[in-house]
Amino acid sequence: GIAAQIFREAGVGKVYEANKRGAVNLYSGVADLEGCSKITGDMILKPSGRFRRHKAIVKLFEIGRANQKLAKSGKIRIAAAIFDADGDRFFRLEYDPFQDTLWVLCGDEAAILQAQYLVSQKINSGALYINTVESDLNASTFAKSLGLRPLLTAVGDKWILLKIRLALLEQKLATGKLPKQKLTYLKNKIRSLKKNGVTSINTLLDLDASIPESTNITKNEVLAVGSEETGHNITTGYL
């Protein structure tokens, strides 16, 4: 699948695709992991272990136990990304060789790891860290300590995407050259959309068309991470 291909291209040492075939999200995917912070060895035992049929979890224990010495020495790390079938959300699993346990990192925890990495690349200073009202408040607090701007939104990745689009319009407006009266009008328009929401995509398209493109290249990204506790994760990409 596409996830395995991307991990290989990114330089991950060994990539195992646990359940490429089979029914969608059956004994796989994120839903099975919700509300579970750790998975112990007895939870994959037959005939009644909770995760005995979850192929990725069973495979991660198998690989972890086979490489326990190396993992304890710190020479390798053994982890998994559990995706839903449509690929829009994931949880990260980390094998703990000292306890023979899998730690489950939800969307908030995975997003913070991603935010730390992006901040280290020096192009995300002051960028947005967007999460929803169901997220852990500590995630926003920590994101702020990294130099990001936390922003809270309603539950649903569509609301995260809307916040991102409005932020991009604000950035475009800030770098464009417009008469003061029109600039004030457009700022107020964006402010209103932030408060009241958008009922038609045409509103955003018309607003975008009314702001001239600028030759100025901004140094920093508008967005670092947009995430939900449930594992939906959004960051900037370029085609």
Give the predicted meaning of each segment:
Residues G1-L239:
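Phosphate-binding chemistry for phosphorylated carbohydrates and sugar-nucleotides
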